[in-house]
Amino acid sequence: MPPTKLAHLVYQTNRMAEMRDWYCAVLGAHVIYENKHLSFATYDDEHHRVAFLDFGPLAPRDPAATELGVKPVEQPGLHHVAFTFGSMGEFLDNYVRLRDLGIRPFFCVNHGPTTSMYYRDPDGNRVELQIDNFATAKEGQDWMLSPAFDRNPIGVEYDPDELVKRFRAGVPVAELLVRD
């Protein structure tokens, strides 16, 4: 039986305050409990959705670091975490709020099943904020079996400011979500 929701994420970090502040800003969360070594935050009725642990110095995580003179490669571990918004308006309002705080996505893409914006937190972890492009999971799954998805399973990049402009101009959401 599958889970019914994402319960929480826990990050071990050397920058607890910076990580906490970043996630609280991005998710509209607030701290439930915090001490010198840990912080718990939530954005809904769950006791905590995101937690941060600081139990002492960790080796810095630098995506650009090299070892033995070779180009770095992805290492095992968390690739990204995704959070879904309930509507295009909420999704884009959140983008504008974050943009105005100086938090900008590094990759914006219409995957087909979702329209997504990818961010990096202060430790370099990837965070995907998304909306579903279909009314039901079945419709999204069916689209993933289409020739269009087979030709390009990653998706089509978009400019988030242009998407905001089109949305505010009254372009129907269904039209904004279309991906060839």
Language model feature labels by segment:
Residues 4, 14-18, 75-126, 131-137, ...:
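Vicinal oxygen chelate
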Residues 6-44:
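N-terminal "first-domain core" detector
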Residues 8, 47-50, 60, 79-80, ...:
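Histidine-centered active-site/metal-ligand motif
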Residues 9-11, 65-68, 88:
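Short hydrophobic/aromatic-rich motifs at helix boundaries and adjacent loops
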Residues 30-75, 120, 126-134:
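Conserved short beta-strand elements that form part of the metal-binding/catalytic scaffold
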